[in-house]
C-alpha cells in the first residue's frame, strides 16, 4: 500500500530484476515487478512519458436522495438497481429512493442535466415528481475516449491499467480484480 502521490513511473533496468521504479511526491521511490495503474484522469499523465497514449475524459455523475410522499411497501418486487434511460434507481428505506446518472461531460454539475434526470427526460411518473430532494452529491469519473469501458490492458510486462470505470465500477470491480490477478500470476 502506497500512502503517497505517485508522480512518475519509469522502466527499471538495474534493480534486482524489478521491472519498474515508482517515484513518489515525498522524493522517495519504490522498485516493483508490477504496477497496476488505477488513477482515473491521472492515468494519461503517468503513462505518456513511457510512450503509451491513453485517452480519458472527465464525466460527471449526479445523485439525489429523494423522500417519497408515500411509503412504498413493494420494494421486494423492485430489483436491487433499476436502470431507465441511463438513470439508475436504488430503493433506500421504505420511503427513500436514490436516483443518479453519470452522463455529463466535464467537471461542473449542470442544473439543466439534473432537472432532466429528475424528470426522467419528461417521462417521470407522478409519484416521483412529488418527491422531495433531501440530499444530493456529485463526482467526476474518467471515461475512455473511443474505447469501451473499463480499460483493462497489459501495456508492457508488469505494467497493467485498470481504469475508466465511469459507470458500474462497483459491479465490475470483482471481474477487474480477477483479471489483474490472472495477469500477475501468468508472468
Please tell me what each predicted stretch does.
Residues 2-21:
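A conserved short coil-to-beta-strand element within the FAD-binding core of flavoproteins
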Residues 34, 39-157:
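Active-site substrate-recognition segment that forms the wall
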Residues 21-23, 98, 160-161:
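General beta-strand recognition
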Residues 2, 36, 160-162:
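Hydrophobic/aromatic beta-strand patches that form the interior of the parallel beta-sheet core
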Residues 159-172:
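Glycine-rich phosphate/pyrophosphate-binding beta-alpha loops
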Residues 173-187:
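Internal hydrophobic alpha-helix adjacent to the cofactor/substrate pocket in enzyme cavities
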Residues 25-34:
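Core beta-strand elements of the Rossmann-like FAD/NAD(P) dinucleotide-binding domain
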